[in-house]
């Protein structure tokens, strides 16, 4: 994490702050946990963002604009995921890594969305590269 991470207050009940940008690149669950540690969102952070935010599909930029209770916003691009054969679902789905892992099925828990729906606690393939948006507990 060589660049300075900027955070924004969305006015969420927890006081949690969200990074204004994604981390550059795609990360497997293990690499994300190793590199970002405590700043990797817990599933409850994604749940809060989903429940408390207003989500709007941005047709031009292909992603979700999330408006917090205080009207501040973040943009979550749909960057798909990195697999063994390159990138998949780019510009149609967003897959964001959380800090948690389901051992019973060997899958990280992710925030997943497309133009029609948001799944704040989805499961995803262990070895795939995911997007990362950091948050900070206050």
Residue ranges and their predicted role:
Residues 31:
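Tryptophan-rich substrate-binding surfaces of secreted polymer-degrading and adhesive proteins
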Residues 9-13, 17:
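Extracytoplasmic/periplasm-facing segments of secreted or lipoprotein envelope proteins
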């Amino acid at each position: 994490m060589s660049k300075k991470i900027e955070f924004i207050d969305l006015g969420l009940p927890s006081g949690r702050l969200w990074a204004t940008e994604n981390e550059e690149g795609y990360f497997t669950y293990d690499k994300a946990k190793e590199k970002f540690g405590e700043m990797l969102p817990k599933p409850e952070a994604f749940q809060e963002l989903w429940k408390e935010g207003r989500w709007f599909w941005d047709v031009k930029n292909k992603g979700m604009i999330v408006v917090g209770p205080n009207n501040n916003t973040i943009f979550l691009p749909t960057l798909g995921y990195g697999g063994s054969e390159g990138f998949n679902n780019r510009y149609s789905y967003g897959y964001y890594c959380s800090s948690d892992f389901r051992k019973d099925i060997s899958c990280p828990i992710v925030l997943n969305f497309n133009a029609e729906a948001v799944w704040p606690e989805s499961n995803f393939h262990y070895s795939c590269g995911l997007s990362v948006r950091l948050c900070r507990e206050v």
